[in-house]
């Protein structure tokens, strides 16, 4: 049976309201006055139950920044999440909820689609972050970082999976994102176990893992769920997108872009946005003496920013020379849907950051047809976007004849 079309969550102390999906049950808190609405089909989108789109359907519903066009690169993949390219131009995709890592063979015949799909790994525990370095394929499962020998030319893995390091497993935010850093270390994000609480282990943090010794240490903390992060070309600065807490109304707190520095503390669970105290935890004893770093940029609330990837300097379309793409998975807990798009962030010479629409149309008139996760510039100059609702990867190409700057997007900031 389908869930009710609209489920309203009365925000009263001690009331638990379920939309028929255990993962969406919430405990409301007494000081809130805003009613949070969850609209069907968002629970279905969370569960990844969308239908695979055709190319015509994608072209019919998606709108892109001027000069860009989208096609379906691969479909019927399952709930596709993180994307990474191999040295041979093939595309790796994590299918987290199915425990798989796929390889999409590069488009050698030029028809705009992957030439084939191979399963590299299966039976994993919610694999999410993936990366390749030094002949190894690294995979971040919910409770461990593991690696296996990988031959990019043969498009094959060999030998057994080796555990590099163990991680705090499970929790409300169970995905672990992994990237190989410029220093050769592994950087792994571990989200919080809860909506808002004081953690007792290495959660709500970005961890640095030595790939040889397996030593794990906290690089940055106070990050509720920084699913996506990347290093900015030129400066080497590390930026991450963080998902703000729930149950403070439609428009607060914002999702954040943070410049992540070693030893940095970014506020959660004690402060949000421009370091405003949390109504539950702002005066918690554990907050005493801590100084949070302010966000570099604030997105709209609950847009669920899950990825950030900078354009390489040698493969940037005009107007995107110092820009990054952000996949906004979309809200489930607002009276009106937010996110469900890919945006671009642009750094001015003075450091000011502006946001523009890059790829929109995944949700229209309250109806969800897709949920973007990763948006990764490829070695061929195209952008590849994963959609874990439709089970697809889209290929976005640029045509200089139609290029023009898109409008600057300013999210609402009621705080």
What are these regions (language model features)?
Residues 2-22:
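N-terminal Sec-pathway targeting helices
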Residues 29-65, 175, 192-195, 211-214, ...:
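Beta-propeller domain segments
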Residues 73-77, 118-124, 164-170, 218-222, ...:
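Surface loop/turn motifs at the tips and blade-to-blade linkers of beta-strand repeat domains
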Residues 76, 86, 133, 179-183, ...:
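Structural WD40 beta-propeller signal
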Residues 83, 130, 178, 226-229, ...:
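Hydrophobic core register within WD40 beta-propeller blades
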Residues 90-93, 136-139, 186-188, 238-240, ...:
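Hydrophobic beta-strand segments that make up the repeating blades of beta-propeller
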Residues 100-103, 136, 144-146, 205-207, ...:
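A short loop-to-beta-strand structural motif that recurs across blades of beta-propeller domains
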Residues 115-117, 126, 131-133, 143-181, ...:
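Asp-box/WD-like beta-propeller blade repeats and closely related beta-sheet repeat scaffolds
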């Amino acid at each position: 049976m389908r869930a009710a079309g609209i489920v309203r969550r009365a925000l009263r102390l001690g009331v638990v309201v379920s939309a028929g999906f255990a993962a969406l049950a919430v405990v409301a808190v007494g000081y809130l006055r805003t009613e949070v609405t969850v609209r069907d089909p968002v629970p279905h989108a969370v569960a990844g139950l969308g239908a695979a789109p055709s190319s015509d359907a994608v072209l019919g519903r998606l709108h892109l920044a001027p000069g860009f066009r989208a096609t379906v690169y691969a479909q019927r993949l399952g709930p596709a999440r993180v994307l990474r390219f191999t040295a041979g131009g093939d595309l790796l995709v994590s299918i987290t909820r199915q425990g798989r890592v796929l390889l999409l063979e590069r488009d050698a015949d030029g028809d705009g689609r992957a030439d084939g799909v191979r399963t590299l790994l299966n039976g994993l525990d919610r694999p999410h972050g993936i990366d390749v370095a030094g002949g190894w394929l690294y995979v971040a499962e919910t409770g461990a970082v593991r690696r296996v020998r990988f031959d990019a030319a043969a498009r094959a893995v060999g030998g057994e999976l080796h555990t590099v390091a163990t991680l705090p497993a499970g929790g409300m935010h169970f995905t672990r994102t992994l990237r190989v850093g410029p220093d050769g270390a592994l950087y792994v994000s571990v989200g919080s176990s809860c909506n808002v609480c004081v953690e007792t282990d290495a959660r709500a943090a970005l961890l640095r893992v030595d790939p040889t010794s397996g030593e794990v240490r906290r690089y940055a903390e106070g990050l509720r769920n920084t699913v996506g992060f990347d290093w900015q070309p030129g400066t080497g600065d590390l930026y991450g997108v963080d998902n703000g807490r729930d149950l403070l109304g439609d428009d607060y707190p914002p999702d954040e872009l943070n410049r992540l520095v070693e030893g940095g503390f970014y506020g959660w669970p004690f402060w949000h946005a421009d370091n405003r105290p949390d109504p539950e935890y702002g005066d918690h004893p554990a907050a005493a003496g801590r100084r949070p770093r302010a966000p570099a940029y604030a997105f709209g609330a609950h847009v669920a920013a899950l990825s950030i990837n900078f354009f390489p300097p040698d493969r940037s379309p005009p107007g995107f020379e110092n820009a990054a793409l952000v996949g906004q998975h979309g809200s489930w807990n607002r009276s009106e849907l937010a996110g469900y798009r890919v945006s671009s962030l642009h750094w001015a010479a003075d450091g000011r950051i502006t946001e523009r629409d890059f790829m929109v149309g995944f949700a229209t008139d309250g109806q969800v047809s897709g949920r973007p996760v990763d948006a990764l510039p490829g070695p061929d100059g195209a952008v590849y976007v994963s959609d874990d609702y439709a089970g697809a990867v889209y290929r976005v190409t640029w045509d200089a004849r139609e290029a023009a700057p898109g409008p600057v997007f300013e999210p609402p900031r009621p705080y």
